[in-house]
Amino acid sequence: MAISKAMRAALSILSYPEIDVKKSYLVEREVQKLLSHRLKNAALYHVWDHPVFSGVHSVPIRIFKPAGVPKSALLLFFHGGGWVTGTIDSYDGVCADMATATGCTVAAVDYRLAPEHRFPAAPEDCYAAAREVFRSAGSFGVEQENVVLIGDSAGGNL
């Protein structure tokens, strides 16, 4: 069955434009930077940055601890973004909301992004962060058995 000229034109209009991911990820990073918002109600949680060292570089981790919550679980969160976009800044609101909604401490990992950092940089950073969080769980106010690894999209893969 042939597609009519009118249908072909409609499909063309409704189709996604051709995107060169090798170029568009830089634009996506800038858009995320502009859209990332600081925390809505900082009285609901305590936030601090905690670097983890992996070889010769540090891996930033941002901790979101709900205020007034006794020892609970810690959600070690790896952000999404196709391994090329996303940061702990762009996920601030998500992590803060997650901490408030669950009553759990959330530790967001800012792993190195491709293509500037080739595989296996991202999984190595995530492993270093997980190792440090498990080793020093008590300093985050949790027991090791209450540390849960979670991720969004590419972060779930990591």
List the predicted regions and their residue ranges.
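Short beta-strand element of the alpha/beta-hydrolase
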Residues: 71-81
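Short beta-to-alpha linker loops that shape the active-site pocket of alpha/beta-hydrolase fold enzymes
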Residues: 110-114
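Short strand-loop-helix active-site module centered on a catalytic nucleophile
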Residues: 61, 76-78, 98, 119-158
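Conserved catalytic-core motifs of eukaryotic protein kinase domains, centered on the activation segment
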Residues: 87-89, 117-119
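A generic structural signal for alpha->beta connector loops
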Residues: 44, 58, 103, 144-146
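Short amphipathic alpha-helix adjacent to the substrate-entry channel of hydrolases
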Residues: 88-109
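A glycine/proline-hinged amphipathic helix-loop "lid/cap" segment
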Residues: 1-63
